[in-house]
Amino acid sequence: AGIINVHLGDSPRCMDLIEQVIDETEIPASQFLPTHVNRNEMLFRKAITYALKGGAVDFTGNEDIDYWETICDEVRVCNGMKRMLDAGVNPNRITISSDGQGSLPIYNKQGEFLGMGVGQSSCLLKEVKECVERTDIPLEIALSTITSNPAEILNLKGKGKIEEENDADLCILDQELQMIEVIAKGKTVYRI
């Protein structure tokens, strides 16, 4: 069975329709992966409740973290993850994704459109680093949000863990959590 990746917006209904489907049908929470759960505080609080019931949730990482927190009122990923973990959410049910190569409109504080940016997948490692350095989330938990957790939740066989018979996809980091080498299917594709 597939997974439905639900992109959440600013609607005051938040996750109500997902919860209605789960409550009123035979479709389990494991079939849904709501993303952008850190879009605003109200949605984020609903996401905590949803995750405490066993649902998986996905934070959207951003390259310009301060902009999205201060101008757009998003819940900063590291702060949101810390709050979820402190609330008792299973860390294996949390992922971070990017809007890599997606369009990102840029607004000022008055909500006026200033231009268009492009989402970067490089934000994932930046968000993991913030989780570790700003909120003391253990590195293995922070890393799992972009490795083993999405692979498990999305049923990606051979991905997400270093195990025999899995694809040999690795990112080697230095002490400052900077990427120094990338190995894809056992072959080095990037090295500083």
Q: How should these model regions be labeled?
A:
Residues A1-Y107, F113-L114:
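Active-site core of metal-dependent hydrolases
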Residues L17-I18, T70-D73, N108, E152-L154, ...:
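Short secondary-structure transition/capping segments
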Residues K46, K53, K82, K109, ...:
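Context-gated lysine
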Residues D86-N166, L170-I172:
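His/Asp/Glu-enriched, well-ordered alpha-helical/loop segment
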Residues K161-I192:
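C-terminal cap of metal-dependent C-N hydrolases
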